[in-house]
Curated annotation (Swiss-Prot):
Top-level taxon of the source organism: Bacteria
Keywords: Ribonucleoprotein, Ribosomal protein
One annotated GO molecular function: structural constituent of ribosome
GO BP term, pick one: translation
One term under GO cellular component: cytosolic large ribosomal subunit
Organism listed in the record: Thermotoga maritima (strain ATCC 43589 / DSM 3109 / JCM 10099 / NBRC 100826 / MSB8)
PANTHER family assigned to the protein according to its UniProt record, in alphabetical order: LARGE RIBOSOMAL SUBUNIT PROTEIN BL17M (PTHR14413:SF16), RIBOSOMAL PROTEIN L17 (PTHR14413)
Tagged with keyword Nuclease: no
Keyword Ribosomal protein: yes
Family: Belongs to the bacterial ribosomal protein bL17 family.
Gene name of this polypeptide: rplQ
Database matches in Gene3D superfamilies: Ribosomal protein L17
Subunit relationships: Part of the 50S ribosomal subunit. Contacts protein L32.
Name by which UniProt lists this protein: Large ribosomal subunit protein bL17
Database matches in NCBIfam families: L17
Amino acid sequence: MRHRVKRHKLGRYGSHRKSLLRNLSREIVEHGSIVTTTAKAKALKTFMDKLVSKAIEAATTDDRARSVHLRRQINAVLGDRRLTNKLVDEIAKNYVGRRGGYVRVLRIGFRRGDAAEMSLVQLVEASSQEG
C-alpha cells in the first residue's frame, strides 16, 4: 500500500524529472542560489538536502573508502568533479553541526508571462545556523 508516500512529479516522466533536478542542483552548487517555480523549488529542496547530507558525511568520515564511495555517488548526480569537490570540500564544511535544512525556499512573486509562482532557492549560510 502507498499510504502517505508522496513524490513531487512536476508533470514530467521519471527520467525527465531526474534530469531536471540534477540540472537545478548543479546550478545551486555552482551559484549558491537560483530562481525557479515554487513546485520545482520544493522538489529541489528535498533532493539537495539528501545530497548535502552525503557531502557532509564524505567530508567528516575517517573511513577513506566510505568517503570515496560518497564522493562517487555525489559525482554521479552532479556529473562534474569540480562541483563535487566544491560541494564536499567547501560547502559541506559549513554545515557539519547541522542536521538538515541546508536549502531555503523563499517565495518572490509571480512570473509575468504565465503568472507561475516563483521562488528563490538558496543554500543557508553557515552563520545563520547558530542559535
